[in-house]
Structures are given as C-alpha cells and as structure tokens.
Curated annotation (Swiss-Prot):
This is Molybdenum cofactor sulfurase. Residues 651-823 form the MOSC domain. It holds the Pfam family MOSC. The gene is mocos. It comes from Danio rerio. GO terms for biological process: Mo-molybdopterin cofactor biosynthetic process; molybdopterin cofactor metabolic process. It is an enzyme of class 2 (transferase). Sulfurates the molybdenum cofactor. Sulfation of molybdenum is essential for xanthine dehydrogenase (XDH) and aldehyde oxidase (ADO) enzymes in which molybdenum cofactor is liganded by 1 oxygen and 1 sulfur atom in active form. Pathway: Cofactor biosynthesis; molybdopterin biosynthesis. It catalyses: Mo-molybdopterin + L-cysteine + AH2 = thio-Mo-molybdopterin + L-alanine + A + H2O. Its EC number is 2.8.1.9.
Length: 831
C-alpha cells in the first residue's frame, strides 16, 4: 500500500481521471446544458438521495401548469366534453406507461394507486390466498429477505388467512433449483402462490436477475420448485425503474408496482400496479367504490363490476390531474436524456467512480475509511444500480454513527439518506444484526427512523448515497472531498492495489437498448354477404371529398382511388394536443380553416392557411428513420398506432392554434377494425375515422333540411341558409349523391357507385360539430336544432359505408358523375 499526498487525491477527483475509467457521462453537450437550466434551484446543493426521490425539472412543472391553465379537465366519471378530455388524456398516459416498459394493453393493464405501497396492498387484498386443507396444500407467500417493508407487510394480510410464509435469501433462490420432473399430481395442483422480489435493492442497489420471473413461474427455482401449484411473481420495480430500463415483454412479471416520484420527482402520492392480463383473472376484489360498478342494487347483494380491469380496481375518482402530469414527465425525461439506457449508463458511471474512490480511501494508519455494503465491485451494470451503501469508520476501525455523519453533511449542504431505509432484511444481513439485536435495540429505545445510530457501539443503520439522471460529476467531487476533509485521519492514504484492480475492468454495457414494439393486428377484406331489393330511383355521385387530416378542411376532387381503409389518404392524419389527445372542431373549431392538399405526384401532404406560408409533410413516413417518434393515441375508444410528423409542422400548427400541438399519422402497417354493423363478415380496416370507411349524404336530404331551417326564421335571416354548398360542407361527407327523395338513403342496405360495391353500415348520428361554419369557424345552433325537429327528435343525417371488394383485388377509382344504384334494406328498422 503506497502513501500518497492529499494532492494525489485531488488529482483523483478530476474529470480527466473519471473519464479515464471509461465511464459514460451526460447526454451530449446541448442536453447537459439544458439539464443545468432545469435544476437551477439546487445550485450549491449536493443532492444524493435519488433513491428516496429524484428531482423534478422545471420544464415539467411549467408544462403541466401551462396544460391545466389552457385546458378544462373535468371528472372522468362524467360525460361532458371536459370529462371526455380527461378520460382520453388519462388513457393516453396509460399507453405511455406501457410503452415505457415495452409492453402493450394486450398484455398488461395499468391500475393507478396512491403509491407503490398502495399497489402492494392491492395485491395483498385481492390475491386468491388459499388456506391449507386436507385435500390441497395452502398458498405460500414467499419473499426475498432483501425486500422493502411494504412487501414484507403483505405477511400481515396472509397470516389472518392461514397462509404459509417463506422468506428466502438470494442464494437460496439460485442454488436450490429444481432437480426433478413434475409428477401428475403436481401438474394438476392449482393452488396459487406468490413470490415477491425487488428488481433492485433499495438498500444496496444490487440488481436481482430478472430471469427469476420465468424461473419462478415455471417452477424451476426455489421455493417454487418445492411447492407445487400455480406460482405468480410480484416484481417490485419502484427503485429499479428510476435509472434502468425494464422490458416486460422479456420478463413478464405478473404484478409490477411502481412509484412515479421515483422516476420524475413529481407528482408525489401517485403510483401504479401493472398487472399482466392473464394474471388479472385470479384477483378477487371485495370492496367496490364509485366508478367500479357496471350495476348494483342497494336492497340486494347484487353487484356486477365493470369489465375493464382498471375500472374495476380504481375505486372512486382517480387523481386525474396528477396522472395528466405524467405525460409531461415522460416527455421531459425523453427530451433531457434521450432514453433510459442513457440514464442507466450515466448514473452507473457516477456510482462506480464514487465507489472506486471511496473504497480506496485509508486513514494514516492504513485502515479503510469506509465499509461498503455490496455484493460486487461495481463492474457490471446488470448487477448493480446507482446506489452506494456504507458506514464510515474512524482510524481505529470503529463505526462513526450515521446521525453524526448526517449532521456534518448538512453543514456542507450535502443531502444523503441514513438508517435502514425500510429494508430490515438487508440491513440485518450487511450490518450483521441478529434477530436478538433488533429486539434488544428496540428495548434500548431505538425504533426505525430515529437518530439512535449506535447501540453498545454497534451500528443500527448505515449511510446511502444514490444518483439520478441529473446528477453530475461535481456531486461526486463534493461528496468525496467532504469525506476526506471531515472523517479521514491525515495524511490520507490511497489503496493503490485496490484502485488499480478496480480501474482495470471496464463496466459492462447493457446487452441491448430498449425499443418499443408496435402492436400489430391482422385484418382481411370484407365481402358481400347480403342481397336486397333494387331501388328504382336515379342517383349520381355529385361530389368527392377527402379529409386527409381529421377535423381539418376538405380536399375536393373529381376522381380518387380507394385504398384498403377507404378513400386513399382519407383521415390518416390528426392533430393532437401536448398530451396526445386528438383535437376536433368540438374543442378547436379553427381546425376547419386548415386546408390540406394531397399531392400524389410529389408524395406530399400540403397544409395551408389563408395568409400564411404553406407547409408540407411526406405522405408516407420512412419508418427506418432513427429519430421517428411513435406513440399510441385513441380514436372513439380504439387504440391507434401513430408516428409523429416532426417539429416543423408542430410549430406551424401550434402558432396558428395558439397552443402546443402536433401532427401525427397512422402507422402504415397498423390496421384497425370497424366495430359495428358487420355481422359475420370479415373485418373492415379503418383509418383514423370515427366509425366507418365512408360517409355518404344525399343532396335531397340537404335541401329538405335547408328549407326547414329557412322556415324557422324570418326573411332577414333566411339568406344565411340559402347556400346549399355551405350546408353540404358542414356535414363533412366523403360522398355526396343526388337521389330523388330526401332521406331515401336511410332505407338502403347496399349500393353500387360505378362498378364499386358498398355495404351500408348504419346511420350517422350528428353532434354539435355540424354547427361549425366550415368557412369561418364560427359556431351556430343550426342546423342541429332544425335537424332534431324535422327528424322527430333524431339527429341522424347520412349513412356510413364499407367498401366490399374481392380478396387481392385492385383498388378501384371513384369519379363524380358515376351512377349510384342502391338496394333497399329488407328491414327499415335495421339501424
């Protein structure tokens, strides 16, 4: 062991030495500068308690504040427009959460809770525990000894039900593996058991193998291999996901509790339980709160829960504003860091460097300054997180009480965590505290969370420093200099042998980066399934309208090809707000002033506004672009996979609409099926339309309504409604025909336009959106008011169509002037 001067330690605390260790640092020059701007409030503070809570960036709070200042978010249990906005935004956040963990709603559901502990309690209260009987063995609740108190606390619920409890060490899980095959009796046993373990220890930062998930589920690892039945795995990911990517498609744990303030720093008091949908079937909920019932009776013991898992388990009104803030958390995290993989590399590099230097510090007599509690040398990013747990020792090898260290750290504005960190099992293991010691310490007056750090000279807890995505090399410097200045008996000695050994091995990089996979759905073309009677009336197709962007202006053509989802490029784009919720003319009437133009030859979509310079985007985005942003959104309750059209068009739209928004396009390979009116027919693929591929209106019906409106008003106002084309535009139909009789289309089952066949799917129910003048974006009560009167209270106008084509047929072209031959429905009450 060589003696070095304090100057050598100062050299060790330089950024050049840090980089020589081969560490990754930061997220690029621009991003690091941006982070410095985001956390100005901690200037002069060395914050090293990110495992307790990370820090929120200023832009997250500003974005959330701007969001709730611009939008009216109502109670999601209501059905008004503000409530629908809340509901849709919350659903968008659910998708973001699942995408963040590389899974989808097909495999997992998100249940919002008040925190990770509440998520754990939810599992404890609803898991189908089975007490032991003469016929079958009882359930086993098993947990790793290195677990948070909130996990071990499940034991309180199981004890009352006669359920067995098994606590196992990490070594036991891996060494006592199955060495026998299952018997028939074991295969048939359905007794449910639960195994709980942390993806990362909140005490030491040790990462436990995610392969435990499948190992326990398949009953290859202990204790599952010795207790037959059906094993479920609860993966406590709260500590892990703050700095590491979690891929649930590879490691499909049944229950995954998380806490969002660990990830974003805000909001507090909000967590979630991610439930694998197959495992959700076993949960048994007894209490039912507001919003969870499909139906119930007050005078009978009759209750039917809602079919959706989240709706069944989220009692009462969820914390919807806090949930909405998560959107800004994900967006800001992506903007500042690029990915969770980048965060993992950055934080592990800081932790490994700090561990390396701290472990080499020695007093003048050669005794080490720190006893570090870990199971590795911080060489593998797959085995160790960004946490260092330790005790400081004086020159005689005695433990310096953690309260004393904490008080000294406060003088230097260094924020660390002390105690046992709600993890008694790990604390006992690393500090060699026996069961009897715990009881004796309690008798001596020490309880969890107090400042009694030593009992009979033995530590009751330890010190923990932990790093977050905004942590800097300066934080490492400040902490290490604090230790040397305050707790080292000078002159300082560095353990050069250990330093050389630790510096010789480069940290292991992750095997692969996280990349969400889109959902894919298979559809086939619809075929003709029903005959009808021909309608002898003479009709022609008078107008063809394409609506490339939902709720924006129409693009009128004289002929146009059909695509697999309707008219080619019809409603493939939509404008969404900053939370990914679709904007429509109901909330943003100015959308109708945006004129899209599809240029097939140039392969572009041009957007133009009167008085402004136009902007173009490609018709078909290149999915090979590495910077392409993908997301999930909702259209009429359906999930849709989309791609973002870029910052330039986003800025263009945001400036015009006066609020942050983006243009997104349906992914070319994503297919969505029409829901209603098909019977036994093959699925019909849709674009971003609300209900069906095509909307048809009849000019005779428009004229009938036009006359009804005129009759309501005196001659002074009559001229307003004499423009038939203006009224046609309000109904935003793709196909406008001229039949002889008004509302004759209501009785059709099929029709042929030229040589192209269509099935009538149903009538189009109208809303207040037809009250928007498509030329001026002003709102009027008409024509909805008169439509209701002349239709005897009904507000349907026009019919939905689906294209009927033979398999693998070429897509036809529709042209105005084509003959329209309808068939009358067998039942006029069909719709």
């Amino acid at each position: 062991m060589d003696t070095r001067s304090l100057q050598d330690f100062q050299d060790l605390c330089t950024f050049d030495v840090f980089k020589s260790f081969g560490h990754y640092y930061g997220y690029g020059v621009d991003q690091q500068a941006l982070i410095d701007q985001e956390f100005k409030r901690i200037k002069g503070v060395t914050y090293l308690d990110h495992a307790g809570t990370t820090l929120f960036p200023e832009s997250l709070i500003k974005g959330f504040h701007d969001d709730i200042s611009r939008n009216v978010y109502g109670n999601p249990h209501s059905h008004n427009s503000s409530s629908r906005l809340t509901h849709d935004t919350v659903e968008s956040v659910r998708y973001k959460i699942l995408a963040h963990f590389n899974t989808s709603p097909e495999d997992y559901s998100v249940i919002f809770t008040s925190g990770c502990t509440a998520a754990l309690k939810l599992v404890a209260d609803t898991f189908p525990w089975k007490p032991m009987s003469n016929k079958e063995p009882g359930s086993q609740f098993c947990y790793l000894t290195d677990n948070h108190t909130s996990v071990v606390g499940i034991r309180g619920a199981t004890a009352l039900q006669g359920v067995g409890t098994i606590s196992v060490s990490p070594r036991e899980v891996e060494t006592r593996a199955r060495n026998k095959t299952q018997t028939n009796g074991e295969e048939e046993c359905s007794t449910p058991h639960l195994f709980c373990y942390p993806a990362q220890s909140n005490f030491s930062g040790r990462k436990y193998s995610l392969s435990y998930v499948k190992g326990i589920q398949s009953q290859q690892l202990y204790p599952a291999c010795e207790h037959h039945g059906q094993w479920f795995v609860l993966l406590d990911a709260a500590c892990f996901v703050s700095c590491s990517p979690l891929d649930l498609s590879q490691y499909p744990a049944d229950f995954v509790p998380i806490s969002f303030y660990k990830m974003f720093g805000f909001p507090t008091g909000l967590g979630a339980l991610l439930v694998r949908n197959e495992a959700a079937e076993v949960l048994r909920k007894t209490y039912f709160g507001g919003g969870t019932a499909a139906a119930y009776l007050v005078e009978e013991n009759y209750f039917i829960p809602k079919p959706n898992l989240a709706s069944r388990f989220e009692d009462g009104t969820i914390s919807f504003l806090d949930i909405i803030s998560l959107h800004h958390g994900f967006e800001t995290l992506q903007k500042l860091t690029g990915s969770m993989t980048n965060i993992q590399l950055h934080t592990f590099g800081l932790a490994r460097y700090t561990y390396t230097v701290l472990s080499c510090l020695c007093h003048s007599n050669g005794k080490h300054v720190a006893q570090i509690y870990c199971d590795n040398d911080f060489q593998s990013i797959a085995e160790q997180g960004a946490i260092i747990n330790f005790s400081l020792l004086d020159c005689h090898g005695r433990t310096v009480g953690y309260s004393q260290v904490d008080k000294m750290a406060s003088l230097f504005n260094i924020h660390i965590r002390t105690g046992c960190f709600c993890n008694t099992g790990a604390c006992q293991h690393y500090l060699a505290i026996s069961n009897q010691n715990v009881k004796s310490n309690l008798h001596a007056g020490h309880i969890c969370g107090d400042n009694i750090d030593l009992v009979d000279g033995r530590p009751t807890g330890s010190l923990r420093v932990s790093f977050g995505y905004m942590s800097s090399f300066e934080d490492c410097q400040n902490f290490l200099r604090f230790v040397v200045n305050c707790f080292v008996d000078k002159p300082l000695i560095l353990d050069q042998t250990k330093l050389a050994k630790l510096n010789s091995a480069a940290p292991i990089e992750p095997s692969s980066s996280y990349s969400p996979s889109p959902d894919r759905m298979a559809v086939s073309e619809v075929t003709m399934s029903k005959d009808g009677k021909k309608d002898g009336s003479s009709c022609t197709l008078t107008n063809l309208f394409i609506f490339p962007v939902k709720s924006c202006a129409s693009f009128e053509v004289t002929e146009w090809p059909l695509g697999p989802q309707g008219l080619l490029y019809d409603r493939l784009w939509m404008v969404v707000n900053e939370n990914g919720v679709c904007l429509s003319q109901k909330r943003e009437p100015k959308l109708c002033l945006i004129q899209p133009v599809v240029c097939l030859a140039a392969n572009t979509l041009k957007l133009q506004i009167s008085g402004s310079e136009a902007i173009t985007v490609p018709l078909d985005p290149s999915l090979e672009k590495s910077d392409l942003r993908t997301s999930q959104s909702k259209v009429c309750g359906d999930r849709v996979q989309t791609v973002d059209c870029g910052e330039e068009v986003s800025a263009w739209l945001s400036e015009f609409l006066g609020k942050p928004c983006r243009l997104i396009r349906q992914r070319p390979e994503f297919l969505r099926d029409m829901k209603f009116g098909q019977g036994d027919c093959c699925p019909t693929p849709l674009s971003l339309v609300n209900e069906a591929q095509f909307l048809l209106i009849n000019r005779a019906s428009v004229c009938f309504l036009q006359e009804a409106i005129a009759n309501r008003y005196n001659s002074d106002n009559e001229e307003t409604w004499r423009d038939t084309e203006q009224l046609v535009q309000r109904f935003r139909a793709n196909l406008v025909i001229s039949a002889q009789e008004p509302f004759a289309e209501d009785n059709w089952s099929h029709l042929t336009i030229g040589n192209t066949q269509f099935q009538v799917i149903g009538k189009c129910g109208r809303c207040q959106m037809i009250g928007v003048d498509q030329k001026t974006a002003t709102r009027t009560q008409e024509p909805l008011r008169s439509l209701s009167e002349c239709r005897s209270g009904k507000v349907t106008f026009g019919v939905y169509l689906a294209h009927q084509s033979a398999r693998n047929s070429t897509h036809p072209v529709l042209s105005i002037g084509s003959h329209v031959i309808p068939k009358i429905s067998d039942s006029t009450d069909k719709f």
